[in-house]
Swiss-Prot record:
InterPro entries registered for this protein in UniProt: Ribosomal_uL6-like, Ribosomal_uL6-like_a/b-dom_sf, Ribosomal_uL6_a/b-dom, Ribosomal_uL6_bac-type, Ribosomal_uL6_CS
Assembly, per entry: Part of the 50S ribosomal subunit.
Disulfide cysteine pairs (residue numbers): none
Protein name: Large ribosomal subunit protein uL6
Entry's family note: Belongs to the universal ribosomal protein uL6 family.
The organism of origin for this protein: Prochlorococcus marinus (strain MIT 9312)
GO BP annotations listed: cytoplasmic translation
Alphabetical UniProt keywords: Ribonucleoprotein, Ribosomal protein, RNA-binding, rRNA-binding
Length: 179
């Protein structure tokens, strides 16, 4: 049994969870999330909790047990609080701005890079160098933040580029030169 999968998912007051076979729908104050879960796992809704259990004792069911519990917990957290990822842009002349809903990043290329957000994702820019990606789906928020970071990943010599707010860049020493 999975240690993560054993613990039930608590459902807050303003959240409703609908279980229709393998389709789990979570509705809350921030929105609605729907997800098709993998086979080999069953769901039981008791009072204000959802209990996930494997249908068989095969390895695939046991592997998906903890995964499905974590996915449902992330869905519940997303519709109540939401998720956000912060990025920092480091470097002279590198900056970001929001035009309409789109994010425009100037990162040292000959052209600015425009990012179009998927449904449910919002971009927020503070002081031209701090970007916040927020939404209710943890997976999509993380993917969008990774796409923005991939425009100009941080380089190890001067640390220029786009990095996550809490990311530490491993710095390398430059050439030592002749002595």
């Amino acid at each position: 049994m999975s240690r993560i999968g054993k613990t039930p998912v608590l459902i807050p007051e303003k959240v409703t969870v609908d279980l229709d076979g393998l389709i789990v729908t979570v509705k809350g104050p921030k929105g609605e999330l729907k997800r098709l879960m993998p086979e080999g796992v069953s769901f039981d809704k008791k009072d204000n909790t959802v209990v996930v259990s494997p249908t068989t004792n095969k390895i695939h069911s046991r592997q998906r047990h903890g995964l499905c519990r974590a996915l449902i917990a992330n869905m519940v957290e997303g519709v109540t609080q939401g998720f956000s990822k912060k990025l920092e842009i480091v470097g002279v002349g590198s900056r970001a701005q929001v035009k309409g809903k789109n994010l425009v990043v100037s990162a040292g290329y000959s052209h600015p890079v425009e990012m179009i957000p998927p449904d449910g994702i919002t971009y927020k820019v503070e002081s031209n160098t701090n970007v916040t990606v927020s939404g209710i789906d943890k997976e999509i928020v993380g993917n969008e933040a990774a796409k923005i970071r991939s425009i100009r990943p941080p380089e190890p010599y001067k640390g220029k580029g786009i990095k996550y707010h809490d990311e530490r860049i491993l710095r390398k020493a430059g050439k030592s030169g002749k002595k």
